[in-house]
Structure formats: structure tokens, C-alpha cells
Amino acid sequence: MEQAARAAGAMLQSMMMGTGMLSKGFYEKYGKEALPIITDVMSRGGVETGKLMQQMMPVKDMNDIAERFKMMAPVMGLEMEVVESSGDVFHIKMSRCPLGIEGTSLELCEALMSQDANMIGTALGQDVEMKILKSVAVGDKECEIIFSKK
């Protein structure tokens, strides 16, 4: 079972990197014109993932979201620090980008991260605001993101 979990984690990592590479290539070719399309696609994917999360691992608040992220981080090979977790706020730091968009732009980061914001919002059944304080996409040493209920 442990070997299967590691294999699943490696496949998830590869899929996320593939999403990042595709988005990065699209962004490099079409510039800012690509951002609304990337945001739309990622947002819709986040909604679908949020529906699955709510069915498989129901959440009530941001504390539950933090627990789900903490559970998934090692599977994804990520080092994640939960800075704050309350009923209304989930604040994290990560040492690397699971999408592999280092050296791109904050706008691309925001477009891709719309998936997480929409996943969380859908799972909670309410709108969620996302603030990206730091991003390796723009050369920061870590990513720092705050998700909060609106």
C-alpha cells in the first residue's frame, strides 16, 4: 500500500508539472492574452476538484482545509508550513512551486492558483479570497499564500 501511495504521489506531481509546463508555454507564446483562458480553465478544474473533496473528505472550515493540505503535501513531495489556520483563514508557505513556474510572473502564478482558490471555495460552499504574498514565480525564495473566507 505504501508503494502504491508513493506511486500515486509521483503521478500527481508529474500531472501538476505538466499543467504548469503547458500553461507556461501558452503564456510564453501568447503573453497576457493567455491569462484569462488559463484562469478560466484552472478555476473550472478547481470547482470540480472542490466537489470531489466535499464528497470524499467533507470540510467545514479553513481548519479542515489545512488538514487536507497537510495530508497531501508529503504525497506531493512538498514541504509546506501552515503559518495560520483558523475557521476563516488558511495561510501557508511552501519552498517550491509544484507547478514548476519559477522565473515566470505573478500573473501566471495567480492564474494557476485560481484552481486552489476555487477548489477551497467550492469545498466550503462559499467564496474564498486568495492573496499571494510571495511567489517563486517572481524570484522569491518561497511561496506564501493566504486563503480567507469572503
Question: Model-predicted segments: where are they?
Answer:
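Active-site helix/loop of acyl-thioester processing domains in fatty-acid/polyketide metabolism
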Residues: 110-124
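N-terminal accessory segment detector
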Residues: 1-91, 95-111, 126-144, 148-150
